[in-house]
């Protein structure tokens, strides 16, 4: 039975020192932890990997929401500023002054990166870019302003289109700004996350997102595999496993092109490739990069040994 994909939810409990533990503190209190991040993907511990306070939430996707600061009539960012919590279980964007937040599962994260600000100043030149797959909660919080599809557009053109929203999270203060919190900070302390302002905050959050995305990578693969095994979700042309090579002309004058209707795993069984191009040799390959400071399993063969 196919598992139901997690979706965004409204968070009613704000992360605090009472219900989460920073990652550095977790390592000190758990001496048996040997750095295996996969062991943290459970509900026994709620670990804080990154985040920050006094953030400004915006959007690159045309949408209407009272939670964003870059609308025609922006809200007071001091009243509706946001806090970001990157946990091992989910991402929480907490809306200060509203009393609730947005809980985002990692399966809904399509892309994350740092984006350079065109009008940035020293120590505040980056912001976080977070692309999320839309669901009912995101549609409620961020109503799309994009034009509706024309009635003449075929349903096939939108069958595999992922509806998304691009959020930007910008620090309010630079690394060099002198700012004092109204309350004593207990989570995002210097001992746990360093200065954690401005560009340092953005870099810390991107590293934390990368680690937590890896923790949940197997969950996404399992969902994709179950979706592929479901006959109702299969492609109509997936049973045709014979890809047709478009000819040597494309190889000489540009990148080779396959007229492929399958699932990109059907490079075998082509007569032109067998007889003309590969001449009985390998028909497909993969480029791999090995770093000098990492141990390799197996051995590497030179071209003369093949």
Swiss-Prot record:
Keywords: Cytoplasm, Nucleus. This is Protein LOT5. Induction: By cold. GO terms for biological process: mRNA cis splicing, via spliceosome; spliceosomal snRNP assembly. InterPro entries: ICln/Lot5/Saf5 (IPR039924). It comes from the Eukaryota. Belongs to the LOT5 family. It is found in: Cytoplasm; Nucleus. One of its GO terms (cellular component) is pICln-Sm protein complex. It holds the Pfam family Voldacs. PANTHER family: CHLORIDE CONDUCTANCE REGULATORY PROTEIN ICLN, METHYLOSOME SUBUNIT PICLN.
């Amino acid at each position: 039975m196919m598992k139901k994909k997690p979706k965004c939810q409204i968070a009613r409990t704000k992360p605090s020192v009472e219900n989460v533990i920073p990652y550095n503190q977790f390592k000190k209190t758990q001496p048996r932890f040997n750095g295996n991040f996969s062991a943290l993907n459970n509900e026994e511990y709620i670990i804080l990997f990154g985040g920050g306070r006094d953030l400004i939430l915006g959007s690159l996707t045309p949408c209407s929401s009272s939670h964003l600061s870059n609308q025609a009539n922006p809200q007071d960012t001091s009243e509706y500023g946001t806090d970001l919590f990157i946990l091992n279980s989910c991402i929480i964007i907490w809306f200060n002054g509203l009393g609730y937040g947005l809980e985002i599962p990692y399966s809904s994260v399509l892309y994350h990166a740092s984006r350079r600000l065109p009008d940035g100043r020293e120590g505040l030149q980056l912001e976080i870019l977070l692309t999320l797959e839309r669901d009912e909660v995101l549609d409620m919080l961020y109503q799309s302003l994009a034009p509706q599809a024309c009635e003449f557009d075929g349903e096939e053109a939108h069958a595999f289109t992922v509806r998304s929203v691009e959020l930007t999270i910008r620090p309010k203060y630079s690394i060099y700004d002198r700012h004092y919190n109204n309350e004593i900070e207990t989570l995002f302390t210097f001992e746990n996350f360093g200065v954690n302002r401005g560009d340092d905050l953005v870099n810390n959050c991107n590293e934390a997102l990368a680690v937590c995305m890896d923790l949940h990578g197997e969950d996404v693969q399992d969902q994709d595999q179950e979706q592929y095994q479901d006959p109702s979700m299969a492609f109509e042309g997936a049973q045709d496993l014979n890809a047709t090579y478009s000819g040597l002309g494309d190889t000489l004058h540009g990148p080779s092109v396959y007229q492929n209707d399958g699932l990109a795993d059907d490079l075998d069984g082509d007569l032109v490739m067998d007889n003309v191009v590969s001449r009985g040799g390998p028909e497909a390959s993969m480029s791999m990069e090995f770093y000098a400071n990492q141990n390799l399993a197996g051995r590497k063969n030179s071209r003369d040994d093949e």
